UniProtKB/Swiss-Prot annotation:
Gene3D superfamilies: Phosphoribosyl-AMP cyclohydrolase
Pfam families in the record: PRA-CH
Subcellular location: Cytoplasm
Binding of Zn(2+), residues: 85, 101, 108
Tagged with keyword Magnesium: yes
One term under GO cellular component: cytoplasm
GO biological process: L-histidine biosynthetic process
Cross-referenced InterPro entries: PRA-CH (IPR026660), PRib_AMP_CycHydrolase_dom (IPR002496), PRib_AMP_CycHydrolase_sf (IPR038019)
Protein name as annotated: Phosphoribosyl-AMP cyclohydrolase
Organism classification: Bacteria, Pseudomonadati, Chlorobiota, Chlorobiia, Chlorobiales
UniProt record similarity statement: Belongs to the PRA-CH family.
Known catalytic reactions: 1-(5-phospho-beta-D-ribosyl)-5'-AMP + H2O = 1-(5-phospho-beta-D-ribosyl)-5-[(5-phospho-beta-D-ribosylamino)methylideneamino]imidazole-4-carboxamide
Enzyme Commission code: 3.5.4.19
Organism in which the protein naturally occurs: Chloroherpeton thalassium (strain ATCC 35110 / GB-78)
C-alpha cells in the first residue's frame, strides 16, 4: 500500500484475523511508549474498542469479551490505534489507569532476564494489590 492509498481505507476492511478469528494486540503507554501487555482481539472486541475508545480484548481462556478494567477499575483509554504492514497485528497506545498486569504491576512485562541469561529480576513497580482487587492470589 502506498502512503497516499491509506486515506480512504477503513481498518475493519483490511484487518487480517487468524484462523481462530483473532489478531494479536500490543498495548503501549501513550506517553512513555512502555509496552504494557500483549493480548488478542476478535472482530467484536476490536469494534467495541473502536466505538468506546476503551481497550476490549478477547479472553482466550474464558472465551469471552474482556473489557480491560471492568473488574479492577484499571481501564485503558485508547488514544491511538495502529495496524502493522501485514494487517495482522494491532498496536494500541493507551492512557493506563492503575496497572495493566493482573498480578498488580504497571506492565505485564515486569520481569527481566539478568546478565547470567537465566535469572529473572523484577523491573517494574507494583501498583495495586491483586488479592485485594480480585479476592484471590494471581501471582505467577
Amino acid at each position: 500500500m502506498k502512503e497516499s492509498e491509506g486515506i480512504d481505507v477503513k481498518l475493519m476492511d483490511i484487518v487480517r484475523f487468524d484462523k481462530n478469528g483473532l489478531i494479536p494486540a500490543i498495548t503501549q503507554d501513550y506517553e512513555t511508549g512502555k509496552v504494557l501487555m500483549l493480548a488478542y482481539m476478535n472482530k467484536e472486541s476490536l469494534e467495541v474498542t473502536l466505538k468506546e475508545r476503551k481497550a476490549c480484548y478477547w479472553s482466550r481462556s474464558r472465551q469471552e469479551l474482556w473489557l480491560k478494567g471492568a473488574t479492577s477499575g484499571n481501564f485503558q483509554e485508547v488514544m491511538q490505534i495502529s495496524i502493522d504492514c501485514d494487517a495482522d497485528a494491532i498496536l494500541l497506545k493507551v492512557k493506563q489507569k492503575g496497572g495493566a498486569c493482573h498480578v498488580g504491576y504497571y506492565s505485564c512485562f515486569y520481569r527481566q532476564v539478568e546478565n547470567d541469561n537465566s535469572s529473572l529480576s523484577i523491573c517494574d513497580k507494583l501498583v495495586f494489590d491483586a488479592e485485594e482487587v480480585y479476592g484471590k492470589s494471581n501471582k505467577k
